[in-house]
Structure formats: structure tokens, C-alpha cells
Regions:
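Short, structured segments at the rim of ligand-binding sites
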Residues: 1-423
């Protein structure tokens, strides 16, 4: 069984290049299914197991895929008619696989997809996806762990109001609307940078979309979309991970691929704690911290432009350096404090009250064996290991591999005493 072994006590110093964003790459690749003419080639595609999984899913639908992880490229040819059933084998492994439903429905008028999988961080309902498809004219059938969408005639544009700004729902409905007849307006759409990135790709393919970066999107359906080339945005959660690791180890790291505009909430909270952050240019920030203790902080996760839920477990580790009690409130998912029990094993003083975790700062963290319960908790535990006395072993690191490219190698180049072992 593979594990990551960390010896704490070394400040991270140097520079690190952030990889392409998984949460942007996956929906962008799904959007590539809409291209009935030409082929698409994607750059800055991260070398991750989830990318391999979605590539295999595409191949099962009849798409030609050439994924070169070492070159960070993926080419796809989706010109042939798509098969209309997405296998449980792939969709159960990764929630983002559900994003094939919109393109399949738009192109073929029918789609059957297994209920999505992914990290066990609470209920992540698909009702907003289905509400949007029904509004466009599809009939939805849910049975035996599958969702089937059928359109007896061409999808027709309409106004869709989301009850909450669902990221996946926004992405799926945008893709379905691109080939629908007439105009579709999505009200209370999610505004995440990864959605903007997908919209930029769709526009380059020939889609007509207005309102990018706002909560109201207007999509004018077109007859066809054409394959093109596109470079995926950098991963803002990976950027946050190295920014927080630099501060937590009292280091000094230049993080390349960390645009300030995509990380405003994180930067604001880190500066509030006393961390020094310099915006070097449009895509880079330098993070340093020489303080023995930071100021406590209150954080509440919210849809963009609020504090990203994917960053809260990592932020929790940084608050362990605060002189006082910090509070992190999770409003997006109801089961995202699984990292807390593992941090307690390292001597962290954290208690849960409802949807909030209260973190008492300045414990003496001690290395031990801990389990990555999900993708982001795994990264949080690696950072905690960098802060702790002694040796920390993180097991179940397959979660980490779903979202981080060469995490131990990148940290080792910054001076961390970290290695991956198989025993």
C-alpha cells in the first residue's frame, strides 16, 4: 500500500509551478463532446487519475482519445455519433463524469448515465442539473442507480432559475443549451473561474454565450460546434495548497500559476492572519511567513466569489498556528470535517459544533499515521506533517492522486523531507 511519509520541521523555500486545474479540465473535456466537426487538443491538462478515467469513459462512448500525461496534452475526436449510455464503471469513480449527460443529450437526444461518485464529503445532489434539462424539454427517468434523459424533439431554450448556484448544474445546462433551439437564460448561475474557463472554450468552438463571470448567463443555441485548441487554467486549489504550506512551515515560496483574481478570498483571509503575500504579476504570488504565531480568523465557505469549500480543510491546518481560537463554518457540504479526527490524532485541539469547527491554535503537533479521507483532507494532512514534530505517515493517498500532480516531488524541490513509499 502506497503512503506519503513526511518528516516535519523544514520551511518550504523556492518556487513551484501549479498544474492545470482538474476542476476546469474535466468540464472542458466534457464540452469537447459537443464538437461534431474537427478535433480538439487541450494543453496544460494535469497528469491525474481522474483525467485518465474520463478519457476511458469517452472511449466507451465512441470518442477517439489521445492522452499524453507527460506532455500535459489530450486530443479528442468526437465527430462520430456518441453512444448514449455512460458506464457505471467510470461514472461511479468520479463525480465529474456526470457532466457527459448534457453534451450527450444535446447531441443525440438521449443519455443514460450512472449516478455520480467521487469523494465522500456529503450529499451533492443533481436536482439542479435535472431541473435544467427538464426545462429545456427533456424527460427525466431515475431508476436503479441511473439517470436517463430523453428529448423527443429538439431542446428548446427557456429561462432556468437555479435554487442555488450549482457548479455542476451550471456547467451541464450550459453545454446542453449550446445546441438548443433559441435562447436560454440561466439565473443564479454559479460564477466560479472554472466555469468561465469552460465558457471561454465553448465560445472558441463557436458557442454564443453572454454574461460570463456573472450570475445570469444567456446562451443562444447554434447549429454546430467545431473542435479547437485550448489551454486549461491553473489549479487554484493546488495554488492554495502551496501558499498555505509555505505559510504553515514559516517558509518563502513563489507560487507560479496563482492569479490573484482567482484567489481573492483566500489571500484576504491569509493576510488577515498576518501572512505576507506579494502579488508578483498576473499569474504569480509570493508567500512568506516569519511569525511564530498568527492571528485567529473566522472563515465561512460560500459559492464564488466567497471562500472556496475545497480550501477549508487546508485552511484549517494554517489556523493551528494562530494564537487563539479560529472558526471555520462549512455552508456548502454537510460532511466536510473528516480531516478533524485525523488532525486530533496529531494532537490538534479542534471541536465540531454544528456546521462549524473551532480550532485552538498553537498545539504541539506530533507525527503519527493518519488517513486521507478525501482529496483535500489528504493535502491538509501532508501540510500538517510538514508542521509536526517527528514522522507523519499519510495512508489512502489514492485520494490525493485524484487532484494533485506529483505533490511529494514538488514539495521536495521546496526543501520538504517527504517521500512516497510502498509497503
Amino acid at each position: 500500500m502506497e503512503k506519503i511519509v513526511v518528516k516535519g520541521g523544514t520551511p518550504l523555500i523556492g518556487e513551484v509551478q501549479v498544474s492545470g486545474a482538474k476542476n476546469a479540465a474535466l468540464p472542458i473535456l466534457a464540452a469537447g463532446l459537443l464538437a461534431t466537426e474537427g478535433t480538439s487538443k487541450f494543453y496544460n491538462v494535469p497528469k491525474l487519475s481522474d483525467i485518465k478515467t474520463i478519457g476511458l469513459l469517452f472511449e466507451s462512448l465512441g470518442v477517439k482519445v489521445d492522452y499524453k500525461p507527460e506532455e500535459n496534452t489530450l486530443e479528442m475526436d468526437a465527430r462520430k455519433p456518441l453512444l448514449t449510455e455512460a458506464s457505471f464503471e467510470f461514472v461511479s469513480k468520479m463525480r465529474a463524469s456526470f457532466l457527459v449527460l448534457g453534451p450527450m443529450l444535446a447531441r443525440e437526444g438521449s443519455a443514460k448515465v450512472a449516478m455520480p461518485g467521487g469523494c465522500s464529503i456529503g450529499s451533492r445532489p443533481i436536482d439542479q442539473h435535472l431541473k435544467g434539462f427538464e426545462a429545456l424539454g427533456a424527460t427525466i427517468i431515475q431508476d436503479a442507480g441511473f439517470v436517463e434523459a430523453r428529448a423527443e424533439k429538439e431542446l428548446e431554450g427557456t429561462t432556468i432559475f437555479f435554487d442555488f448556484p450549482s457548479v455542476g448544474g451550471t456547467q451541464n445546462v450550459i453545454m446542453a443549451s449550446c445546441l438548443a433551439k433559441g435562447k436560454t437564460t440561466i439565473v443564479n448561475a454559479a460564477q466560479e473561474p472554472e466555469i468561465e474557463d469552460m465558457i471561454n472554450f465553448l465560445i472558441k468552438m463557436g458557442a454564443k454565450i453572454e454574461g460570463k463571470g456573472t450570475s445570469v448567463l444567456v446562451i443562444e443555441g447554434v447549429e454546430k460546434l467545431v473542435g479547437t485548441e485550448y489551454t486549461v487554467m491553473p489549479d487554484r486549489v493546488e495554488a492554495a495548497t502551496y501558499m498555505i504550506a509555505a505559510a504553515a512551515t514559516k517558509g518563502d515560496v513563489l507560487v507560479k500559476g496563482a492569479p490573484y483574481k482567482d484567489n481573492v478570498a483566500l489571500v484576504s483571509k491569509m493576510r488577515e492572519m498576518g501572512v505576507n503575500i506579494e502579488v508578483v504579476d498576473e499569474t504569480s504570488m509570493r508567500v512568506s511567513n516569519k511569525l511564530d504565531s498568527l492571528r485567529p480568523v473566522d472563515v465561512k465557505t460560500l459559492p464564488h466569489p466567497g471562500f472556496l469549500t475545497d480550501m477549508q480543510s487546508i485552511m484549517c491546518v494554517l489556523t493551528l498556528l494562530a494564537d487563539g481560537t479560529s472558526t471555520i463554518t462549512e455552508t456548502v457540504f454537510e460532511n466536510r470535517f473528516m480531516h478533524v479526527e485525523e488532525l486530533r490524532r496529531m494532537n490538534a485541539k479542534i471541536r465540531i459544533e454544528g456546521r462549524s469547527s473551532l480550532i485552538e491554535g498553537l498545539p504541539h503537533l506530533e507525527g503519527t499515521t493518519v488517513r486521507a479521507t478525501d482529496l483535500r483532507s489528504g493535502a491538509a494532512l501532508v501540510i500538517a506533517g510538514l508542521m509536526a514534530t517527528g514522522i507523519t505517515k499519510v495512508i489512502d493517498i489514492y485520494h490525493i492522486d485524484r487532484g494533485y500532480v506529483d505533490i511529494e516531488e514538488k514539495m521536495r524541490k521546496l526543501g520538504a523531507d517527504i517521500q512516497r513509499i510502498d509497503e
